[in-house]
Amino acid sequence: MLKAVAIIAVVLAIGIAGVLVFALTKPDTFRVERSLALKAPADAIYPLVADFRFWTSWSPYENRDPAMKRIYGGTASGRGATYAWDGNNNVGAGHMEILEASTPSKLRIKLDFARPFEGHNTAEFTFVPQGDATLVTWAMYGPAPFMSKLMQVFINMDTMIGKDFEVGLASLKKLAEK
């Protein structure tokens, strides 16, 4: 019996070590990106993203906690606009600040998560005219510390976050094309 327990312990230790070593092979940075063509001009779409107060109309994260606390600060929109949120476990808590606003082509946002996991990333929106439409790209990128790499062994971040971006872009499309 003792020999069987020892064998199981060794197998578990090797398995855990294997997962940890595999996590170390993951990239040191990540990037998730989705794009969608919206049949609206960039100057009509841009304000819906540059003003955080409009995010309640299209962001997939806003509906996950109707009681979420929101604090808007800085400028009303564009560079310097800030947004802090504190909600349930589905949305966590964090802070965003628009660092770069190139009307109507690009927004770069500093994105700091406090809960459920601490993280410091960058979100970026680009708006590229294409005939009578605008290609909107929503991206998030940043460092991948060891805990993120370990999570990536079990969870595909691109799939998980990418689905949210797809839902958000589809909602933004409905709003912009009204």
Whereabouts are the PLM-identified features?
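Short beta-edge strand/loop motif at the mouth of beta-sheet-based domains
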Residues: 53-95, 104
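Sec/Tat-exported extracytoplasmic proteins
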Residues: 49-59, 87, 165, 169, ...
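Hydrophobic ligand-binding cavity/cleft-lining segments
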Residues: 6-72
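Generic structural detector for well-ordered beta-strands
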Residues: 35-39, 84-86, 97, 108-110, ...
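A generic structural signal for beta-strand entry/edge sites
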Residues: 29, 80, 104-106, 131-135
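Beta-strand/loop substructures that line and gate deep hydrophobic ligand-binding cavities in soluble
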Residues: 100, 110-166, 172-174
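A generic structural micro-feature
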Residues: 26-28, 75, 88-90, 115-119, ...
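Short, surface-exposed coil-to-beta transition loops
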Residues: 31-33, 91-96, 118-124
